[in-house]
Amino acid sequence: MSTRLLCWMALCLLGAELSEAEVAQSPRYKITEKSQAVAFWCDPISGHATLYWYRQILGQGPELLVQFQDESVVDDSQLPKDRFSAERLKGVDSTLKIQPAELGDSAMYLCASSL
């Protein structure tokens, strides 16, 4: 197989409808080549202290990758730490990075927040 296989990195916005508040996530869709770095960004609902990153592989339910309370990691037991990293600065926005991306990383990556 060619090493130039494309990995499909898709994500969708997961919003909460509280007086038009929503989680902002970008990019909405990401297609990349194998071995490239991928970064997703999430801006939670204002005032929400807890932030979650999920991965949903086609045909499966969502899997929690990491949970933050403000800047602190509460649970990252399912985060593949060899290539995945996540951070939340100042208890506000968060980034999820995959480097290098592999074909098996093809999934929806979802961000959510709560009080």
Swiss-Prot record:
Primary role: V region of the variable domain of T cell receptor (TR) beta chain that participates in the antigen recognition. Alpha-beta T cell receptors are antigen specific receptors which are essential to the immune response and are present on the cell surface of T lymphocytes. Recognize peptide-major histocompatibility (MH) (pMH) complexes that are displayed by antigen presenting cells (APC), a prerequisite for efficient T cell adaptive immunity against pathogens.
Complexes and interactors: Alpha-beta TR is a heterodimer composed of an alpha and beta chain; disulfide-linked. The alpha-beta TR is associated with the transmembrane signaling CD3 coreceptor proteins to form the TR-CD3 (TcR or TCR). The assembly of alpha-beta TR heterodimers with CD3 occurs in the endoplasmic reticulum where a single alpha-beta TR heterodimer associates with one CD3D-CD3E heterodimer, one CD3G-CD3E heterodimer and one CD247 homodimer forming a stable octameric structure. CD3D-CD3E and CD3G-CD3E heterodimers preferentially associate with TR alpha and TR beta chains, respectively.
GO cellular component: plasma membrane; T cell receptor complex
Single Gene Ontology BP annotation: cell surface receptor signaling pathway
Record-linked PROSITE patterns: IG_LIKE (PS50835)
Main location: membrane
One Pfam entry name: V-set
Ig-like domain mapped to chain residues: 22-115
InterPro entries: Ig-like_dom (IPR007110), Ig-like_dom_sf (IPR036179), Ig-like_fold (IPR013783), Ig_V-set (IPR013106), TCR_beta_variable (IPR050413)
Keywords assigned by UniProt, alphabetized: Adaptive immunity, Cell membrane, Disulfide bond, Immunity, Immunoglobulin domain, Membrane, Receptor, Signal, T cell receptor
Subcellular location per the Swiss-Prot or TrEMBL entry: Cell membrane
Cystine pairs: C42-C111
Taxonomic superkingdom: Eukaryota
Signal sequence bounds: 1-21
Protein's name in the database: T cell receptor beta variable 11-1
